[in-house]
Structure formats: structure tokens, C-alpha cells
Amino acid sequence: MIVRTEDQKLVDVDDVDCSFFLVTVDLWSADGKQEMNLVLHPSSTDKYAPPNPPTKPSASTTRRRTISSSSRPPGHQASNSSTPAPPRPDEQPPSSNGSGYYPSQSQDNLTPSSPYPPHSNSEQPQTWGYPPPPPIDRAAPFPPPVLPSIQSFNRTASGDWNPSNNDDNYPIDPALRNPEGYTNNAQPDQPTYGSGTTYPPNYQTPPMPPNSGNATPQNNIPRNLATYTRTLVGPLSANACRLLDEHRKPGIFFLFQDLSVRTEGTFRLRMRLMNVGAPPAPEPGSCRVHNDISPILAQTFTEPFIVYSAKRFPGVPDTTALSIAFGNQGQKLPLRNRHGTGSKRRRRNQSGSEGESEDDS
């Protein structure tokens, strides 16, 4: 660093308080017109990976989903046995031949002694000994599902029916309560059979969308974002040091011991000088660092230099006399030993002396 007065006269180094001077560096292009501190690199992190990868469904799950999603009219129920109560609609196991659903009969035709209707497939043998079912008109509309009576929830201890119109206690879907084409002439009670078991109404289970649990919303898929990497690596700032140059003249120097560039090409370093001391800095007498913004006192660019890859690197250049002078003053610099270290020369001398002594003997 060279300090001049307003009259362009050099200021003596001993008259400058260099305790709070600081220089920062950044990387620029060879012409000094474009900043090169960041470089764009492709990265594997740009590829989107779903947080929960879809798992392959098992064979039983696929078979059950295929059977349950097959075309069946609403209101049908499976008949796997003759007397036990049927399970819930969402837990009904599929039959072995996949045709275990039958249309619901009207209440007039159902009597306690009437058996369950067998399978609708007429080609299969009569396993249970029941007569063949009557022909079914599949073009006819199916009756709407019959809901349980609301009065059954407010029955008193004496057995009387106590109607209630309070919809808040027992919320029911309005679409199920009054479906289209459904009248209020339906009988409130369900048919009972000889065993005394009351069967719940038939509800149509909504079809499950395929891979609904593994579907990933489109809004959560991030776009391919650019990944930037810092090109100039190392200590990007240095404090001022009062040292002697190779001619034994004092001066103020800023040393950057280990700077490296990750990209090939020709670059320059931009250096900016600032003072981080509290007033009266930069005049002598400052005792602490300020917490405000530091103005740029000076700025300059280095000479262009070439960065090589590991394969094209021509080799480490010779150490300059100025670097040797700084190293002799205790500065830690990556210096290259041109003639080898003293220990290697010592080993070489010792091996040579031992060889001469053996020849003399």
C-alpha cells in the first residue's frame, strides 16, 4: 500500500497507523468487466425425488382392489353364509369367483323363511341346494338405499317411539336422506329373519382412486433450480502488515496465503481497501473497530493470470525474492524449495560419506 498526500507526496510508512486497514478480494474476468465469483454447475440435487416413493402393491391387494372396483350395481350385498350377520360394506371379503354381489329384493318378497338368493351366475353348479334365481333385468333402475329410522335412536325405556327432529345430534348427509327419485313412503323398519338378526341397509362404497396414497401433488414438485458454486476459495480478506521487501525497504503489505480458483480460464483479482477502525481512523489514535459501514478508500485490479486444470498444469513457478523475504520475516507462505530442504541434503551428504568410507575400506 502506498499512501500519498493531496500534493501527491509519499507518506512515510511509520506515519501511517495500519492497525485497522483491510483489503478484500474477489474474482473478475480478464478484461475486468464481469464478476466471476460464482459459477453455474449441474448438480444431482436438482433432480426431484418424491419424499415417499410409491411401493409396489402385493398380489392380494391388487386382486382385492380389482374385484371391489369391478362393475356392480348399488344395493347389492354378498352372501358368503346363510345365517351370520354380514360385515360392514367396506370390510366385505370378495368371493372366490368374483361374483358375490346380488341385487336387493323388495321387502314384500323377503320373508323370514325365504333363503338368500344364490349367485347370479347361472352356469355355476348349485352348491347350496337352492333353486335357480329368477331372471334379472339389469336395465331396470335399482332402488335407493334404505336408511335406518331416526326414531330408533330416541326410543324410551318403555319401548315407545319418541320421534325427534334434532339434526344436530345425529348428522346425516342430505344426499342420503333425500336422494333423487326417493319418496318418503319407504318403511322405516328393516326386515327381520327367523334367527332374529336385523341386517343393516346396504351402502354403496365409493370407488378408491388408483394410487391415491402415492399420488404427489403437482404443486410440491420443485423446478430445476440452478446450483451456483463459489469460484474463488480461500481467505478473501487480509489485514495490513508492516514488512520489509526484498530490498530491505519498509512498506505496508496485504498477504493472501492460500487462494485457489475452481475453474479454468484467465482472471483478475479486484482489491478493495477500507478502514474498519472507529474515529479518528484512518488517522492515528483509533482504539476499536466501528460497527458502521466502511467506505471503499481505494480499488485496483491485478494483472491477468491463467488458471490451469490438474492435467494441463505446467508446474509450480519459482519462488520470487519478495516471497522469500516475507517468509524470512515469519510469514506463513506456501514457498517452493528450489534446491530441496536441508534434511534431504543432509541425508544425501550422509549417504555419500558412507559410500566413500566403504570404498576406502
UniProtKB/Swiss-Prot annotation:
Keywords: Cytoplasm, Nucleus, Sporulation, Transcription, Transcription regulation. Pfam families: Velvet. GO terms for biological process: sporulation resulting in formation of a cellular spore. The keyword Lipid metabolism does not apply. Residues 108-127, 149-168, 181-196, 212-222 have a biased composition (Polar residues). Residues 1-336 form the Velvet domain. Induction: Expression is down-regulated during fruiting body formation. Residues 42-222, 327-361 are annotated as: Disordered. Residues 57-74, 93-107 have a biased composition (Low complexity). InterPro entries: Velvet, Velvet_dom, Velvet_dom_sf. PROSITE patterns: VELVET. Residues 130-147 have a biased composition (Pro residues). It is found in: Nucleus; Cytoplasm. PANTHER family: SPORE DEVELOPMENT REGULATOR VOSA (PTHR33572), VELVET COMPLEX SUBUNIT B (PTHR33572:SF3). Component of the velvet transcription factor complex that controls sexual/asexual developmental ratio in response to light, promoting sexual development in the darkness while stimulating asexual sporulation under illumination. The velvet complex acts as a global regulator for secondary metabolite gene expression. Component of the velB-VosA heterodimeric complex that plays a dual role in activating genes associated with spore maturation and repressing certain development-associated genes. Belongs to the velvet family. VelB subfamily. Component of the heterotrimeric velvet complex composed of laeA, veA and velB; VeA acting as a bridging protein between laeA and velB. Forms a heterodimeric complex with vosA; the formation of the velB-vosA complex is light-dependent. This is Velvet complex subunit B. It comes from Coprinopsis cinerea (strain Okayama-7 / 130 / ATCC MYA-4618 / FGSC 9003) (Inky cap fungus). The lineage of its organism: Eukaryota, Fungi, Dikarya, Basidiomycota, Agaricomycotina.
